[in-house]
Swiss-Prot record:
Specifically methylates guanosine-37 in various tRNAs. It holds the Pfam family tRNA_m1G_MT. GO terms for molecular function: tRNA (guanine(37)-N1)-methyltransferase activity. S-adenosyl-L-methionine binds at residues 110, 129-134. The lineage of its organism: Bacteria, Bacillati, Bacillota, Clostridia, Eubacteriales. This is tRNA (guanine-N(1)-)-methyltransferase. Its EC number is 2.1.1.228. Coiled coil: none annotated.
């Protein structure tokens, strides 16, 4: 997959040069292209924003630099143009899975008080992280892109790594433990030391169900319980 990122602050995405995504780039599994919107402005002072018509606080990103940067990206990337903004649908794991199946994507990061309305006709999709305010689109783009890339085959190394993670099927992940066995009076559950893989699997499933029911009822209502799930929950409630 190739992802083109349109931004005023390309240095913010240096985080992708490290860890899992860094290795995926080295192995040519994914390609990240950074395009600085400021490089495409026609203003001699490299200005990319201006005062809003009708008055109001702050500055608005002008259409010309953004649209020209989108056109430049599309010269070698025919993917959907995704804008990180408050009007969009709230991003979730299903959206990440759907987008991970695309061959290419283009992400547009806004800044200041927003973008000129005339840019929207060049945008295919708008997504939001939630009902709160961030300094810029870059801060929203990083987790969105990361969540998409880790679903691409070969990025994590083995499929089980993301199948078992939180939200992969509307469930929170089960509790994890490592050494030491005892820490400040708390012990690792004995079942995890039993070596009985089927019992461990059932225990983990029950923990995921129980945690989701208690902490994320909004997710739990979407869970389709299997016969085994109902049996496990029934035993716990006795």
């Amino acid at each position: 997959m190739k992802i083109s990122i349109l931004t005023l602050f390309p240095e913010m995405f240096s985080i992708f040069n490290h860890s899992i995504i860094g290795r995926a780039q080295e192995n040519n599994i994914v390609e990240l292209e950074l395009l600085n919107i400021r490089d495409n402005t026609l203003d001699k002072h490299k200005k990319v924003d201006d005062y809003p018509y009708g008055g109001g606080a702050g500055m608005v990103m002008a259409p010309q630099p953004i649209i020209d940067t989108i056109r430049k990206a599309k010269e070698n990337n025919k993917g959907k143009v995704i804008f990180l903004g408050p009007r969009g649908k709230t991003f979730n794991q299903k959206m990440a899975m759907d987008l991970s199946k695309e061959e290419n994507l283009i992400f547009l990061c806004g800044h200041y008080e927003g973008i000129d309305e005339r840019v929207y006709k060049h945008i295919d999709m708008e997504v939001s992280l939630g009902d709160f305010i961030l300094t810029g689109g870059e801060m929203a783009a990083i987790p969105v892109i990361d969540s998409i890339l880790r679903l691409i085959p070969g990025v994590l190394g083995k499929e089980e790594s993301f199948v078992d993670e939180s939200f992969s099927e509307d469930l929170l992940e089960y509790p994890q433990y490592t050494r030491p066995y005892e820490f400040e009076g708390e012990h690792v559950p004995e079942i995890l030391l039993s070596g009985h893989h089927e019992n461990i699997r059932k225990w983990r499933r029950l923990q995921s169900l129980d945690l989701t029911r208690k902490r994320r009822p909004d997710l739990y209502k979407n869970v389709i319980l299997t016969k085994e799930d109902k049996k496990l929950l029934g035993r716990k409630n006795k």
